[in-house]
Regions:
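Active-site neighborhood of glycoside hydrolase catalytic domains
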Residues: 190-240, 244-260
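Active-site-proximal structural scaffolding
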Residues: 96, 106, 119, 130-133, ...
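Extracellular polysaccharide-degrading/modifying enzymes targeting complex plant/algal/animal polysaccharides
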Residues: 1-107, 112-115, 159
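Surface-exposed acidic, glycine/proline-enriched linker/cap segments
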Residues: 84-100, 159-178, 183-185, 245-260
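Short glycine/acidic-rich loop motifs that flank beta-strands on beta-rich extracellular proteins
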Residues: 72-78, 100, 122-128, 146-153, ...
Length: 260
């Protein structure tokens, strides 16, 4: 009885039957005929991973011109602690590596991700974790991600080794309609990272932040020339550009265009 309008679905877990009422294409066309539609069941927790293991480094790789879509949520959860709250990471203690990313980067250097369309993934669209440096994420369209659009996050600042992203660039991307499943998210999320540049991005239609600067001992991230609009649509205590934590110092924010 709860299935009463187009776009809704219901699972009968006892009989193993999924009921789905197709969404309305337009007032004139009505609901999409289900026999003409396409049903996709995600089975991968991550589509592509740039990762350094031992002496084999992930460097000088270009990922361009791809459509990346349909991952699971990977049983993702919020990271613990202020430095990562709002970022999704694998379920602790379960041996999982990924949580629904289209692209996961760990230990990558001098890589380029440009001109891709990333949409309808279960978790973060692009997850840049731990040591990553001098990578460029440019000119991608990212939409309908289950969590964050692009996440740069460190894992440990009490260590002489740089276990955090630094000197990366996120530029000229269009990020919109993310946070489908997790609402405490941002178009671009930074936590425990240093010297990254977030510039010339269009970020819109987000349930929470446009850009979020989490707890950081380092600072020195540059946020500039971004257009941010229609954010904070489903949650409170947030902002188009949000910064908080124990040491939110040294960041530069300038020339942000705001509309709504």
């Amino acid at each position: 009885e709860e299935l009463d309008q187009p776009g809704e679905w219901c699972l009968d877990s006892v009989d193993g039957v999924l009921y789905f009422w197709p969404p309305v294409l337009s007032e004139a066309e009505g609901p999409e005929p289900i026999e003409q539609g396409e049903v996709a069941v995600p089975v991968l927790d991550c589509l592509i991973s740039f990762e350094t293991k031992g002496a084999r480094g992930a460097s000088w790789i270009t990922l361009s011109g791809f459509k990346l879509t349909e991952t699971t949520t990977g049983d993702n959860m919020h990271r613990e602690g202020n430095e990562g709250y709002g970022a999704m990471s694998p379920l602790a203690g379960q041996g999982r590596t990924y949580c629904g990313e289209a692209l996961h980067m760990r230990g990558a250097e001098h890589c380029r991700v440009e001109g891709n369309h990333i949409y309808a993934v279960g978790g973060n669209a692009v997850y840049i974790e731990d040591y990553n440096t001098r990578n460029i994420i440019r000119d991608n369209e990212i939409s309908e991600a289950g969590a964050i659009g692009i996440c740069l996050i460190g894992t440990n600042y009490a260590c002489p080794i740089r276990h955090y992203p630094f000197y990366n660039k996120v530029v000229d991307n269009h990020i919109h309609h993310c946070g489908v499943f997790n609402k405490y998210v941002a178009g671009v999320f930074l936590g425990l990272c240093d010297g990254n540049t977030i510039a010339h991005n269009l970020i819109e239609h987000m349930p929470h932040h446009g850009i979020n600067l989490g707890n950081s001992q380092y600072g020195r991230n540059i946020i500039e020339y971004n257009e941010i609009r229609n954010t904070c649509l489903e949650t409170s205590d947030n902002g188009a550009i949000n910064a908080w934590g124990e040491d939110p110092w040294g960041h530069v924010t300038r020339d942000a265009e705001r509309s709504g």
